[in-house]
Structures are given as C-alpha cells and as structure tokens.
Amino acid sequence: KETGDYDILKEQVDYKNDPALAQPLLDHLKRSFYHVVNNKGPHGLPLIGRADWNDCLNLNCFSRVPGESFQNTASNIAKEVNPETGAPLNEETAESVMIAGMFTYIGPEYVELCRRMGDNAEADKAQAEIDKMKEAIVKYGWDGEWFLRAYDAYGKKVGSNENNEGKIFIEPQGFCVMSDVGGKEFTEKTMASIDKYLGTEHGLVLNNPAFTRYIVEYGEISTYPGGYKENAGIFCHNNAWIMCAAAYAGMGDTAFDYYTRIAPAYQEDEKLHRTEPYVYAQMIAGKDAKRFGEAKNSWLTGTAAWNFVAISQYILGIIPDYDGLKIDPSIPKAWDGYSVSRYFRGATFNIKIENPDHVSKGIKSVTVDGKAIDGNVIKGITSGTHEVVAVMG
C-alpha cells in the first residue's frame, strides 16, 4: 500500500533461514493464513497454543510448581484430567477469540492481494474461510455485550460475564469491531462495554475485574497483583487497537479521547506518571493498583508504532491504500479542521482538512491543486508537491 510495488510479493524469502527452502513472499503469507485455518478447536475458533499476543494467558500450561516456566505446555497438560469427562486434557481445546478477530481483520488483505495478483480462485477460497470464522465468532465468541477472550483447556469461557473475575478482556474487542463481526449491533454494544468496564482516566485496563488469586488453568496472568501488567493493568499497546476501532466506527470523539489518555505529552502530573514525556510506557498501573496512573517499563513496547497508526491513519485519516492515498478522517466533532503534510510514492501532499459541518466522519469533496477528484483516493501522482483540500460532511 505504501509503495504500490507488487513485485515484493514475488521476492524469494527463506524458510528456516535456508536459501534452499526459499519461496515467494506471497507463499509465506498464504502459509500464515492457512496455519490459522488448519489449527482450529471445537468451536471452529483458532487454537491458542502456548499463547497468543498475551504471552501471560497460558491456557495450556498448568504450572503447579513455583519457579516453573509457564511455557511447559506439552509436559504439564498431559497430566491434567477433565473432571467432567475423566479424559486427559490436550492442546486441541483452548481457543483464542483474539486470534479469530485478528484473522477476520487482516485476512481480507490477503484476499485483496490474491485478486491483484490474478489469483481469483485463491481469493474466493480465502474469503470463504474468513466468512466461516466470522460465523464462528458470532455463534461462539459473543457474550451478549462484548466478545469472549477465549475458551480454556476445559472448554470453558474466558472473558465472559459467567466468570467471577476477568469477565471482559480488551484484546479481541477492537479487532472484532474492525472486522464488522455482528454488524452495527455488536459494535455499539462492544464499544459501550469497553468504556463502561475497561475505561479509566489513565487509559483502558486489559481486563476487569482483576484476578485476586492464582488460577492454574489461566497461568501467569493471574500471578500479578491487581492493576499491574497483564492483570488489569493499562497495557498501552492494546489501547491503540480500541482507538482504531472507535475511529473505524465513526466515533471520532471517543477515539481521540482514548488517544489523549495514554499519550505521554498529555500527562500533566509528572509526579504520578513518572515517565519521560516523549516516550510511551509498556503499561500504566490500573485502577486496582496502589499507584493508579504510574507508568512503567518505558521504551519496552510496541505502543509507539500502533499509536502512530491510530492517530495518523485512523483518526487523522491519511491512509496509504492500494490505489493511492486515501483521505478518511474520524475526528472530534468540535474540530474545525487541520493540516497534514504527507510524502507518498514520490510526491508530497500538503493536505488541508476542513470540517464546516462539525462531523466526525465523512468526506464531501476532495480537490488536488484546485481540481476536484472522484471519491477520496488520490491516484496516479508520483512526483512534485501538491495542495489538497478535503471537505468533511
């Protein structure tokens, strides 16, 4: 999308760092896609394996010895027995709704790449798998007001209103919203639940309520004190996913509000925040912590990259796309407008966004160097400096 150069998909890339096993990059993407398709659990959702993004949610671990690694899945889970069935547990049961959401969020990009490379048969096949995954999320991954987090090794819900602790987790919510899983109804309920149950003045907590005891079938996440790290801390990395989801849903005020809650430059109480005003922290202590609002582990996070995407592409709406530079903001209604300079595919675009009707989303017109264009994608300009005016409405 950034370069418009599809030849990169033909580049030979090693498997296992072995040049003899090299295949085109597109083949690597295909294998990644079908790794999810071919590794599903009882509900048709992706198996979580050792962990997904949250490496402290160890649903196949069953660590009962202090100091033992939370990644020793193969040796420990085989010793466990399902008390309801008497059968030994295995790694073919615990599923991740987060991975399902990520799959339905990014999978369509693989479909589009296949179409642009002329492989419509593969594109249709992949799209069918995405549709099937969405159906599984709706049927088995929806809890009524938000999306489940997972199913554990016993096949029980994680991140459900049925749980006493850890009723709701942040990770699957944004990806499922941006995938349009369940349509407008699910989106509205999910975003409302995020604000109600995860929202705090210092950011969105990862889960709620916090765990107050060690839960062997959940693993490391339940070992931290409440409000810290993955146990109901404010994990800045995944706050950005909710900013993106809010912007995608046209909730520009909410998206920017969430952005300011964790952005270092907006933190005025340095005695509380205690982290440099120019760097993101991995986490901010959550509402259950003794020092609620104190940032920890600066520089150790993918937050900066995700927040750059959230503010530049989802909120300000300057989006590299396959056919050109797309203008699609989702901003606070009170904004009159703003200006952005963007270098893209050899050209510099000085972009002025005007918001006379004070809306959050929607582009009424776009002009490039005074000439109106159709739609909101600037195409075919590969040199020079150009003045762009986009009017919202």
Question: Across the structure, where does each feature detected by a protein language model lie?
Answer:
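Alpha-helix C-terminal capping/termination sites
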Residues: 2, 115-116, 179-182, 245-248
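Flexible, glycine/threonine-enriched loop-and-boundary segments that flank and lead into catalytic domains
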Residues: 150-164, 223, 343-354
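Aromatic-rich carbohydrate-recognition surfaces in CAZymes
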Residues: 1-49, 96-100, 104, 187, ...
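Heptad-repeat amphipathic alpha-helical coiled-coil interaction surface used
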Residues: 103-104, 111, 123, 130
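Juxtamembrane interface elements at the cytosolic ends of transmembrane helices
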Residues: 7, 106-116
